[in-house]
Amino acid sequence: MKDYTNEINAAVRTLGDIAFKEASRTCPVRTGRLKRSITLRTQHDRAKNADSCVIGTTVPYAPNVEFGGRGRHPKPFLENGLEAARKSTVLIFSLFMKGDQ
């Protein structure tokens, strides 16, 4: 049986990139600080031989923008990125598993 670890890790990294790009694209911009603070970090767990992606921001007001607060309506941008990756998951994994990436 073939080991698909490399293909799975590549698909995870691609989905992380999709989520990052969509979060950046849909991030509300007033000064641009929030949008510039969005980062994508890929991590590799050697014990599991598995990649993971973390997308986020360290701007203190990011949760108030994402979820709303104090009379402000939510303006999700990280959730938009997650949703874009979720919608692409089956397609991306099928392409990488077939070798069509």
Model-derived regions, located:
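Short, Lys/Arg-rich flexible segments
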Residues: M1-Q101
